[in-house]
Amino acid sequence: IGCSPENSQVMIQSVRAGRILDLPSLPTLSDGTAGGVEPGSITLDFCREFVDEYMTVTESEIKDSLQEFIQAQHMLIEGSAAVAVAACKKQGDRFAGKNVVVVICGGNISLETLKEIL
């Protein structure tokens, strides 16, 4: 499952269109997924081939997931990683009783953003 912030759905919309789209994005805590897809990037083809479905999460869901993950795991993650955590939480009933892997990478979060979410 691929996931994006509602405020920046460029990848999802590009996959659906079958080509890289130049779409506006609103501010998001998920800096790493914000904005466009670079021309010539392998990312679009990779997503088209290996991602079966897509979903979005709100800024509130990203913020809540950041806070909860930091508190529960005592690890710092960035907003992009929290998008995946938020998506998994959003699908909780679907995954109940199953083994689920959420790919979490990156701790690149500014002090200003960290202060904002805490």
Question: Model features per residue range: what roles?
Answer:
Residues 40-96:
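Active-site-adjacent helical/loop segments in soluble small-molecule enzymes
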Residues 1-49, 95-96, 100-118:
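Glycine-rich phosphate/pyrophosphate-binding loop at beta-loop-alpha junctions
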